[in-house]
């Protein structure tokens, strides 16, 4: 069974039914530092070092000349996302992908659903006065779904979304983007944007070495009291696209 801080899961990564209440809360309580005050900054395209939690990390995303020409490529082996317009790189960032037992699906897909402030209908929180406890719906209290910010669905129950990025596969099949990158990815793609997911991509050789890594594995858990508010969906400051 997963335990402790090193085994955190986030966003739409499914909560196994065997999780204890405390483990489920740990699973649920990981989003806010990436979406609210204290979100990290992402820098791509100029350095290859690893950035630890709390270090500056800033993503530059470029506005496409032709939005209909935007393509998304995911390299599972490198855990990189390349947003391309022809040969032009619009954004190249690190991500977290599925663990071996729950892999991210490979193949050609299209973005077919987007929701900036999506919440889960199957797990989240029960708000009971001043008490907030993990919940899968039903029971006492007011149910508030787990925040799945900047959700871009490419296959049933699989999507790109905001969450902690680890330097190793960590999700239950979805693709997590850092809190500074997820809103920019959301702005770049539209319904119908093609997505290719493969073990490797040609861009691994050209763009991959320039993608700065990030390690959120030791980022502290945010409070559940913020998870149930709109503060879970705050945008980064400044323009999303250059």
Segments and roles (model prediction):
Residues 2-4:
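Low-complexity, intrinsically disordered Ser/Thr/Pro- and acidic-rich segments
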Residues 46, 51, 119, 125-242:
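Exported/periplasmic cell-wall-interacting domains
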Residues 46-120, 124, 137-141, 149:
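Cell wall/extracellular polymer interaction/catalysis modules
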Residues 32-42:
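Bacterial N-terminal signal peptides
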Residues 20-33:
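Bacterial N-terminal signal peptides that target proteins for export
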